[in-house]
């Protein structure tokens, strides 16, 4: 069987994560297919609506996803991985993923708390999967919104089979139990603001791998926010201790 295409989007501001994924992905059963997006496109499309998720109203991800599903069908490729770039990748991804393909699921999502997270997707190249994502796109055209929120809404009408990954083996940084050995971690942020978001993701990544070789790819204007984020964590911890005493 030919390697499974593993697509992820990245832009210059996220080169830090792009280089990490390139160096970390060791499974020969996958073929990495990085999709570089001009930084100007992200600058134009993201953080458009104050007070909303920074992906609100952006079609970048869903349009690329649909394009790659069409391409997979044309090439008789049974499955694709379509993911974000801000990941911690450890050995054993394919063996952990294979069971979902053996069970012939149409779609497999990350589970983040009570909802589906679309940052790491295993997708069967099929018409019903394409129809599902087209439904989400149509919903976004009709009323501007967040693709992930619409994915959770549209799943209720999906006629195929779907499930979620084991939520500790394929985990999110805000739902990991801090003890299970994971193979994928989606590094999330608290949405404190554009610069803080990146700083928080870098800080969280540094808890799991040596990031020093990759700090050369971090923009200089982000560095002060990393230190500030650590200060906020320490402040929050002290406040929590004080509240517990009182």
Q: What are the language-model segments listed below?
A:
Residues 32-41, 109-110, 145-149, 164-169:
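A generic structural motif
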């Amino acid at each position: 069987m030919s390697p499974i295409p593993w697509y992820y989007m990245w832009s210059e501001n996220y080169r830090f994560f792009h280089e990490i994924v390139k160096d970390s992905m060791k499974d020969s059963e996958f073929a990495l297919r990085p999709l570089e997006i001009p930084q100007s496109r992200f600058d134009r499309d993201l953080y458009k609506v104050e007070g909303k998720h920074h992906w609100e109203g952006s079609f970048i991800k869903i349009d690329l996803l649909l394009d790659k599903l069409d391409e997979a069908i044309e090439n008789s490729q049974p499955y694709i991985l379509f993911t974000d770039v801000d990941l911690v990748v450890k050995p054993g991804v394919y063996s952990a993923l294979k069971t979902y393909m053996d069970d012939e699921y149409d779609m497999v999502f990350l589970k983040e708390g009570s909802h589906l997270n679309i940052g790491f997707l295993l997708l069967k190249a099929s018409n019903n999967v394409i129809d599902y994502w087209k439904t989400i796109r149509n919903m976004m055209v009709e009323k501007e919104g967040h693709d992930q929120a619409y994915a959770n809404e549209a799943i209720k009408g999906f006629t195929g089979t779907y499930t979620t990954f084991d939520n500790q083996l394929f985990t999110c940084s805000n739902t990991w139990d801090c003890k299970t050995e994971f193979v994928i971690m989606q590094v999330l942020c608290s949405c404190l603001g554009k610069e803080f978001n990146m700083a928080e993701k870098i800080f969280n990544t540094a808890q799991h791998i040596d990031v020093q070789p990759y700090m050369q790819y971090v923009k200089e204007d982000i560095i002060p926010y990393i230190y500030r984020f650590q200060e906020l964590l320490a402040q929050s911890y002290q406040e929590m201790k004080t509240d517990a005493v009182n």
